[in-house]
Each structure stands twice: as structure tokens, then as C-alpha cells.
């Protein structure tokens, strides 16, 4: 059975491929995670997961418990968010790993919170909401705030983002008539 090992240096793989410690990809697409018990030749099976991130989070929860806070983690910014096993038994480590993996389950409304309390979030829209957005005209009342902005507001906003030099160049170019507006 051939596995794609992630986390080790192998130049056969695409340079852009994500790599995480303690995981590998099965040829049928599932990601698996396991960790070696310190001082032993045995491994603790942490599970099979849908995504690499789920498997990597499972590994991190186990590594944090077995090796301590000084160990290299896949998601070091989440060290305080990972579940802790009740004991050092393989069953408790596996349970904590499963819980950590669920933090990254696809379809969750938000990613795990970072130490600062600021996490990435996803907005889930229903098919009806997406259809309503696609069907509303660009000049609908919902877009009215754009019409309320004066030219001075645009200049100020542009200057804040791109600097004075670029702003002046941009508005200088705006004085020339666009080829799309010509009546030729």
C-alpha cells in the first residue's frame, strides 16, 4: 500500500503542497495520523480524517500531551485551544486527538479561535440568500451607500490606501475621457 508522507523532505512532491507533521495521505484520499510514544517503539493511532488539517490537529493534541509545550506543532498558535487527554492512556490521547480534529471539520461556521480571541470565520449563506444576492440589481437600494459618497470621499479613501503620489496620478488619469464613453 503506497502512502504519501507529508512532513518529511522529499523532492518528488509539489513544492506548493502543504506539509504537516505526523500525518500521511492514503492513496484513496483520506488523511491519517499517528504518533510514536516517547521512549517506546509503539505508535498510537490517532485516526483517519477527511482533511490534512484535521489529521494535523489530531497529531498536535497528542504531541502536546506526550512531548510538552516545547514540541514542534503544526498549529502552534492554537496551543491553548487543543483538548487535553484525561490521562496518558492511548484511549484518552485518541479521544483528545479526535476532539482536536473536529475543530477543523469542514463545514464548521468558524475556525478555531486564536490566542488573541480573533479567529477566522466563514459566513454560510443559504441557496435562497445566494440567489437573492445574484438577482438584486447593482443599483438596488442596498447599494445606495455607494451613491452617497462624494468624489472627495473617494479621493480621501484612495489616498489612505495607496498614498498621495499614486492618488494624484490616479485622479489625473480620470480627467481623460474613457474610450468606452466616447461617441466616435
From Swiss-Prot:
The keyword Transcription regulation applies. It comes from the Eukaryota. GO terms for molecular function: DNA binding; DNA-binding transcription factor activity. CDD domains: AP2 (cd00018). It is found in: Nucleus. GO terms for biological process: ethylene-activated signaling pathway. PROSITE patterns: AP2_ERF (PS51032). The keyword DNA-binding applies. InterPro entries: AP2/ERF_dom, AP2/ERF_dom_sf, AP2/ERF_TF_ERF_subfamily, DNA-bd_dom_sf. Its main location: nucleus. Pfam families: AP2. Keywords: Activator, DNA-binding, Ethylene signaling pathway, Nucleus, Transcription, Transcription regulation. Signal peptide: none annotated. GO terms for cellular component: nucleus. Belongs to the AP2/ERF transcription factor family. ERF subfamily. Probably acts as a transcriptional activator. Binds to the GCC-box pathogenesis-related promoter element. May be involved in the regulation of gene expression by stress factors and by components of stress signal transduction pathways. PANTHER family: ETHYLENE-RESPONSIVE TRANSCRIPTION FACTOR ERF022 (PTHR31985:SF100), ETHYLENE-RESPONSIVE TRANSCRIPTION FACTOR ERF042-RELATED (PTHR31985). This is Ethylene-responsive transcription factor ERF022. The gene is ERF022.
Amino acid at each position: 500500500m503506497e502512502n504519501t508522507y507529508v512532513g518529511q523532505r522529499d523532492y518528488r512532491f509539489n513544492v506548493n503542497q502543504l506539509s504537516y507533521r505526523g500525518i500521511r495521505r492514503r492513496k484513496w484520499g483520506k488523511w491519517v495520523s499517528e504518533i510514536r510514544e516517547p521512549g517506546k517503539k509503539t505508535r498510537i493511532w490517532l485516526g483517519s480524517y477527511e482533511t490534512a488539517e484535521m489529521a494535523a490537529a489530531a497529531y498536535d493534541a497528542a504531541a502536546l500531551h506526550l512531548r510538552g509545550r516545547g514540541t514542534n506543532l503544526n498549529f502552534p498558535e492554537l496551543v491553548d485551544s487543543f483538548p487535553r487527554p484525561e490521562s496518558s492512556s492511548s484511549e484518552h490521547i485518541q479521544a483528545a486527538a479526535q476532539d482536536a480534529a473536529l475543530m477543523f471539520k469542514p463545514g464548521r461556521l468558524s475556525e478555531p479561535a486564536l490566542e488573541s480571541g480573533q479567529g477566522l470565520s466563514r459566513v454560510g449563506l443559504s441557496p435562497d440568500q445566494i440567489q437573492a444576492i445574484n438577482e438584486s440589481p447593482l443599483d438596488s437600494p442596498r447599494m445606495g451607500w455607494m451613491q452617497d459618497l462624494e468624489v472627495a470621499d473617494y479621493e480621501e479613501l484612495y489616498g489612505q490606501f495607496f498614498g498621495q503620489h499614486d492618488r494624484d496620478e490616479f485622479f489625473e488619469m480620470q480627467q481623460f475621457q474613457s474610450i468606452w464613453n466616447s461617441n466616435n
